[in-house]
Amino acid sequence: MKSLNRKNIINMTVLVTLIVCYALKFLVPAFYALTDKYAGLFVFLCECLLLVNNFNVFKAIKEKDKEFFFISALILIIGINLIIVNSGFGAFFTAANFALIIYASDKIILSKKQVIFLSAVYMALLLFWLVILYPSYFGSYDASFALNTNGAATFSTYTALLALILLAHFYEKHSFFELFIVLLFVRILRLALWHRARGAFIILTVFIFLFYILKGKFIESKKIYTAMVFMATFGSLIFVLSYTLIGKTGVNMFIPIFYKNVFSGRENIWYEFFSYFIHKPLTGIGTNLTIESFVEFNVHNAMYDILVIHGVIVFIMTMVIVFKRFNSYREKAKKNTLALLALCVLFAVFYESFIDMDLIWADYSVNLIFLTAVINAKYEE
């Protein structure tokens, strides 16, 4: 009993600490500037602590646990590849954190009460942000604020969907909470459109489609579900290829609600990264280079980032872990509504990361940890 209590205390302390850091990163510009370059390392250490706290590593080594040795080999290869190409240090944590979070997701088992508590923390953060800070930061569309407007919309949408778990829990007992859910969606949708944030809009609309329109029925068919996982991963690369080929023809269309063109520069970014990648397909290109197509080193696609920065071997090994865990997520989502909700959010973030990096960005890592923990939580109490 004491060991169980100790494990729960460590789990909750680490997760709450990560959520607090997540809040400070977005709400306090000075904190973001001070800690940004250490975010990946901090997440990696926290994830290692969670893994050791919930999984007997020494037993896994002694019993020659194949999956444990697989993830260890993957993390080692990530590091070796980056050394070979003389890459920047931070790239290691981008790929390693994502792989480790997905791998450890079936080992960090929270109770329903812990899930609800953490969702309540997200709700408190969301309310504080929307009611108190947001009006002062963006009431006059102050573009000079350190947190860019697109990031503010994605942060708001992502946080809202994690807070939605709390409302969904209460809705199961009290139907009038449906009103609060509708109000939340209206507010977040308006915010996403006002900021002209395509990423936030994609997350919200994909989630609503999967959870409320399809009502999660996609998990009933293994073939459809597997196809969705394939599209969320390998389909992202197909999207990059198609988008780049079409964009290079010069054709374009204007999206009225976002006041942006369909092809707004990503085709050039992705083409440039590919031009480097074809010379180093096994090791990836790393990050020790300057690109000409954008003002910063940003791949703008999570799956493509893992592929071009870390190479084919790392990408394939990462996909093995992703597909294996997603198979288990399906079984979990069949048994519980909150797990299904979290799975739909996870899919939404995967699909949003066709055009951005939010799936593997260190600042959003705690959200990924929480989503996978909600899916794998123990709801029978």
Language model segments and positions:
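Transmembrane alpha-helices of multi-pass inner-membrane enzymes
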Residues: 339-352, 358-381
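Transmembrane alpha-helical segments and their membrane-water interfaces
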Residues: 48-60, 73-129, 162-169, 212, ...
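Helix-loop-helix junctions and helix-breaking kinks within/between transmembrane helices
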Residues: 30-38, 84-93, 149-153, 182-216, ...
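Long extracytoplasmic/lumenal interhelical loops at the membrane interface
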Residues: 255-310
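Hydrophobic transmembrane alpha-helices and their immediate junctions
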Residues: 8, 57, 63-68, 221-222, ...
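Alpha-helical transmembrane segments of multi-pass inner-membrane proteins
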Residues: 110-139, 150-215
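Transmembrane signal-anchor hairpin modules in multi-pass inner-membrane enzymes, especially those
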Residues: 1-79, 110-113, 169-179, 331-335, ...
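A membrane-periplasm/extracellular boundary helix in multi-pass inner-membrane enzymes
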Residues: 134, 212-257, 274-276
